[in-house]
Amino acid sequence: MEALKTATFSPMSVLSEKRSEPRKPFSLPNLFPPKSQRPISQESFLKRFNGGLALLTSVLSSATAPAKSLTYEEALQQSMTTSSSFDSDGLIEGISNFVTDNPLVIAGGVAALAVPFVLSQVLNKKPKSWGVESAKNAYTKLGTDDNAQLLDIRATADFRQVGSPNIKGLGKKAVSTVYNGEDKPGFLKKLSLKFKDPENTTLYILDKFDGNSELVAELVALNGFKSAYAIKDGAEGPRGWLNSSLPWIEPKKTLSLDLSSLTDSISGVFGESSDGVSVALGVAAAAGLSVFAFTEIETILQLLGSAALVQLAGKKLLFAEDRKQTLKQVDEFLNTKVAPKELVDELKEIGKALLPQSTSNKALPAPATVTAEAESATATTTTVDKPVPEPETVAATTTTVDKPVPEPEPVPEPVPVPAIEAAVAAQVITEPTETEAKPKPHSRPLSPYASYPDLKPPSSPMPSQP
């Protein structure tokens, strides 16, 4: 009977069942116990989670819709399903369905999370410390930035052939250091000696047009310099320094020496200390001065001569007393030492030009007229002090006429008077003295052959034929 009575009972709600225990206030299960409690296992955690989830769904369903009574079988089935394991496939399917149903919401959430991350990376990223700049921009920044310097890495031969950039108008000077790709530590060591504060120095690097400037810019930027930029197209490129019409120093056509190798070798022997550098500079300066003195010796002598003339004029000719004494000394020197020598030399040159040279030749004697003139000349020279009376000459002529003329004898050759003695006699006897007898003109010829036409003068002997 009791079984039949229970079978005929109407179904009742589980929640409305009366219990003998006092009702406790409603509270959600404690999913996260305090740390002081002992850790629970995974199974108990899943059971509690499922129970809480079922209770939550029932509360929500009762709040949204009027409560419905459940049968005993439904309540039993519901409790059995809640106690089963957690269905992960259903959760994933639910999430995928939510994403497909609400794409804009998902995209907005992703953007909201991604934008702050991207901005933080962009804003906190440091700028690149090396790069490439055009020649005009580099020149402008060299003028505006006090810590910017121009580094020329070309070879020495390029300096001699092409020239070098001129930044003196900006108050700076280009630093030249030849780049050797095989010796990068040595190159960096040279730069450290030339730039004392590399952490605050920005370099603008100029090459020929071979691309080495970009390699050097990256090298120095990674090794202590603040930043470094390669000048685009270098010095000789189509948009380089020269073709951009920037200031340029043309190469000099004088003798130049490359002492960089000598300096490097000496610094390698003595090290990079100050003593080694001073020795290298001293040797280079001595070599340069010696070569300059050897090539410009003529100019140096001219300068010394000009300095001596200026000193002489300042000391000897500036004041009146010194000027008089100097002029007196010059006059004495010219009159006592220079003038006599010049006079004797001039007389010798005049004598050689006017008088014939004395040569011994065996030619025919001069005609009678010439001998007569020579005799008269010798008579005048010998009878300067004692004039010859005229009657004796007349008597001599009369006596020679009366006597018969003997056969002519060979006339001896007259002794020639030296030309120098004749010249001296002509110079000494310039005016006749008072006691000298002036010859009177003869009315008759001196030759006796004019009075005797039958007589003929003797013929001169023929010279011997060779």
Curated annotation (Swiss-Prot):
Start and end residues of each Rhodanese domain:
144-250
Entry-linked InterPro entries: Rhodanese-like_dom_sf, STR4-like
For this UniProt entry, which segments traverse the membrane?
Answer: 103-123, 277-297
Q: State what the entry records as the consequence of deleting this gene.
A: Slight reduction in rosette size, yellowish inflorescences and siliques and small chloroplasts with irregular morphology and no starch grains.
**What coarse category fits the chief subcellular location reported for this protein?**
plastid
Q: How does it sit in the membrane?
A: Multi-pass membrane protein
Query: Which residue ranges have biased composition labelled Pro residues?
Result: 455-466
Which keywords does the record carry?
Answer: Chloroplast, Membrane, Plastid, Thylakoid, Transit peptide, Transmembrane, Transmembrane helix
Q: In which tissues is it expressed?
A: Expressed in leaves and stems, and at lower levels in flowers and siliques (at protein level).
Listed GO biological process terms: photosynthetic electron transport in photosystem II
Q: In which compartments does the protein localize?
A: Plastid, Chloroplast envelope; Plastid, Chloroplast thylakoid membrane
**Composition skew (Low complexity), residue ranges:** 373-384
Q: Which domain of life is it from?
A: Eukaryota
Name a GO CC annotation attached to this entry: cytosol
UniProt-annotated stretches for the region Disordered: 1-35, 373-392, 426-466
Q: Where is the transit peptide, renumbered to this chain?
A: 1-15, 16-69
- Protein task: Rhodanese domain-containing protein required for anchoring ferredoxin--NADP reductase to the thylakoid membranes and sustaining efficient linear electron flow (LEF).
Task: Cite the PANTHER family for this sequence.
Answer: RHODANESE-LIKE DOMAIN-CONTAINING PROTEIN 4, CHLOROPLASTIC
User: What is the protein's quaternary organization?
Assistant: Component of high molecular weight thylakoid LFNRs-containing protein complexes containing LIR1, LFNR1, LFNR2, TIC62 and TROL proteins.
Q: What is the official name of this protein in its record?
A: Rhodanese-like domain-containing protein 4, chloroplastic
Species of the source: Arabidopsis thaliana (Mouse-ear cress)
